Amino acid sequence: EPFITTNVEGTFHLLEAARKHDVRFHHISTDEVYGDLALDDPHKFTESTPYKPSSPYSASKAASDQLVRAWIRTYGLRATISNCSNNYGPYQHVEKFIPRQITSIMEGVRPKLYGTGENVRDWIHTEDHSSAVWEILTRGRIGETYLIGADGEKNNITVLRMILKMMGQDEN
């Protein structure tokens, strides 16, 4: 339910406020709306890839993206959308994958992977994401959707091994 409240209802209220005050709107979404790709899949997501959300979170983000598109089409709202890959960087919430692993290691707790650790995500630093959003805000075309990524696809086990190495810890 929190995903629906935040991502669907929250987006609705923001869209209505932008419409009421006639301001430009930029909606930040996730690449998770497109579903999953295997690490060795030769295809990449594009702005025209059909949505295939695989979790309540990604479904709620897909719904919010569609609300933005409807407000653009119906009300002429000046808006853009970006779908970004996984962010990492300073001050990230500890429940997120990278800070959770680092915190566990620092506390002497064995890091945990869910499943096999083979699920793949593209990773982008928060500063790079912010720069991309700024480019969209200053140069993007109203009504367009932009994918933001870093071509940094790695599975979770690889990311965890990188963290362990950087922290001087044994992979086992």
Specify the residue positions occupied by each region the protein language model found:
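C-terminal substrate-binding subdomain of Rossmann-fold SDR/epimerase-dehydratase oxidoreductases
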Residues: 105-172
